[in-house]
């Protein structure tokens, strides 16, 4: 009986946390119809990361078309882009697009944002990445700027890519943001992508029929096999506003 009560109280605690995160999201986005899945495991790893992820999810939905961006990512992955690297790059660009906007609208978020990025650096980058891991070095450079409150000196090549991330903050529509993500992927991650697979126009021209016929099972857990495409699009769309490495967040 004691164990049952304990299980119940853990469930109650999780539900309470879910409600808190959900309410915060709704408040920031101003959209109370937003379908939100709060990440309680992440909250237990770092309160600030979970809340900041949630706030950013709400803010992104307010300023941009999250479904259009999610579909772009899935189409690019369909054409053999690296899921992990493309998602990680998109996450960084989304941070560049809405991070500062949220802080200007709600000054209280600034401290939470800094603490969230500090927690990610502490938990994921105990040792600095090697020189050839450009995306990780770019992520660290952007995080350090936010934490310091000013642009920090970095090498010329890295600075040029970092400037592109900051250009995301000036974007007015989703397609503009997609262009920056696509350009950065084809420069930082896979300089041969366009030659092998085609331009952004080719990516966006991938049809729903092509996507539906593709076997997304390799990218999903077994219980998600049914309606695989729909589940995969949902999974990518949910993950793209995060910044942390989800594999470190245990249930």
Q: Locations of the language-model features?
A:
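Basic/hydrophobic alpha-helical interface regions
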Residues: 1-169
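Negatively charged
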Residues: 141-251
């Amino acid at each position: 009986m004691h164990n049952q009560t304990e299980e119940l109280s853990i469930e109650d605690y999780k539900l309470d946390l879910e409600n808190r995160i959900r309410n915060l999201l709704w408040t920031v986005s101003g959209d109370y119809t937003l379908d939100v899945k709060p990440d309680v495991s992440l909250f237990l790893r770092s309160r600030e990361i979970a809340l900041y992820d949630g706030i950013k999810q709400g803010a992104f939905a307010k300023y941009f078309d999250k479904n259009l961006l999610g579909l772009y990512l899935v189409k690019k992955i369909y054409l053999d882009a690296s899921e992990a690297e493309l998602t990680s790059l998109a996450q960084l660009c989304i941070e560049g697009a809405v991070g500062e906007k949220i802080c200007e609208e709600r000054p209280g978020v600034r401290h939470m944002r800094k603490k969230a990025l500090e927690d990610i650096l502490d938990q994921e980058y105990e040792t600095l990445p090697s020189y050839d891991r450009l995306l990780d070095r770019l992520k660290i450079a952007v995080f350090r700027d936010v934490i310091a409150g000013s642009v920090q000196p970095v090498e010329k090549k890295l600075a040029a890519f970092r400037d592109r991330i900051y250009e995301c903050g000036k974007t007015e529509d989703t397609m503009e943001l997609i262009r920056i993500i696509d350009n950065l992927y084809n420069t930082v991650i896979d300089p041969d992508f366009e030659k092998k697979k085609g331009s952004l126009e080719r990516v966006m021209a991938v049809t729903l029929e092509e996507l539906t016929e593709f076997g997304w099972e390799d990218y999903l857990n077994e219980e998600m096999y049914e309606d695989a495409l729909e589940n995969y699009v949902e999974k990518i769309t949910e993950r793209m506003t995060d910044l942390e490495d989800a594999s470190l967040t245990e249930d």
